[in-house]
Amino acid sequence: MKYKIIKTNDQIQASVIEMARRINKDYRNKEIYLINLNDSAKYLIQDLKKVLKPKTKIIKFKYENYKVNSNSNELRILKDINYTLYNKEVIIADGIIISGNTHNYITKYLKLRMPKSISMICIGIKKNFLEKKIPKCYSLFSFNNEWIEGYGFGSQKTKNKRNLFDLRK
């Protein structure tokens, strides 16, 4: 099956450079603790690291989503952070933000460690679907109803491709 390319790697790279410009300005002379959620932003982080100026420590954080039939938005943490985040500049990295429920939960969880600040980066955000407030977010793109995969996240067919695809039929 052929999927529709909605963002080419060239378009993605241009947006990564723009994102880096904004982060470089906002975090000038600061160290960033960049937390990669479930490796869903691995390509974004790889490309961003090439143009980020602040010293950056990349940390993996793994979790399991809450159960579909449950009323709880709790996450099960599979790999926690082994660094102190006290008074640190924290940026959470993820693929696509849809409802914001997961990011709201993780932000509250990380705030218990008293970082100086928490913001986010993502490949895309679906602002029309946000249910929860999230921290300041640097996003490559905004999406509506597209089913986005590629550029490091999604199914095995598209995950390792450098473009973004819309999988809607």
PLM feature spans:
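PRPP-associated nucleotide enzymes
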Residues: 1-169
